[in-house]
């Protein structure tokens, strides 16, 4: 992970700090349908000011996805890990955090049981430079809809296919 520190003096400047862990944006495997629900408040708690009409109930929209399978990719840069003191224990903590990402994470946006980590694939190279590029490793996992599935609604509607890379075997863990 990294950080940008902004400083203000006579001249504004910022300093970027790079960390060894890189986490990409999650991307849906199949297109998702975004549904909307209109919401209102049931009680008007706003006071009427002199000369003003009472405020009407606030109405808004809540948008949600009933089902989506998302893939997130990442990596750990060994050179930056050495420079920053990132350890094997830290890597194990990141791995466990990914596996348990949605444990005790319920909210109105993510009701309990609505989000889960299906599986974590964790590759460990046998050298600092890596046996393969991150892009090649990421492409070695293919996720696609099973034959005959038109509208996926569960993770089981997908096939998870590992294309072997010689000398590099992932650790595969189920999420919690």
Regions picked out by a protein language model, each given a short descriptive name:
Residues 1-176:
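RNA-binding basic/glycine-rich loop and surface signature characteristic of RAMP-family CRISPR effectors
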């Amino acid at each position: 992970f990294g950080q940008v520190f902004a400083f203000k003096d006579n001249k504004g400047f910022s300093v970027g700090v790079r960390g060894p862990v890189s986490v990409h944006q999650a991307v849906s495997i199949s297109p998702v349908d975004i549904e909307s629900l209109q919401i209102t408040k049931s009680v008007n708690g706003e006071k009427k000011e002199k000369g003003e009409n009472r405020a009407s109930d606030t109405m808004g929209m809540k948008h949600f996805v009933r089902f989506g399978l998302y893939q997130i990719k990442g990596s750990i840069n060994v050179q930056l890990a050495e420079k920053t003191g990132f350890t094997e224990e830290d890597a194990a903590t990141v791995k466990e955090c990914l596996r348990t990402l949605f444990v005790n994470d319920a909210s109105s946006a993510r009701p309990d049981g609505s989000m889960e980590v299906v599986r974590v694939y964790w590759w460990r190279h046998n050298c600092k430079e890596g046996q393969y590029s991150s892009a090649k490793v990421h492409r070695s996992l293919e996720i696609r809809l099973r034959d005959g599935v038109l509208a996926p609604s569960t993770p089981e509607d997908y096939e998870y296919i590992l294309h072997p890379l010689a000398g590099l075997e992932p650790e595969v863990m189920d999420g919690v």
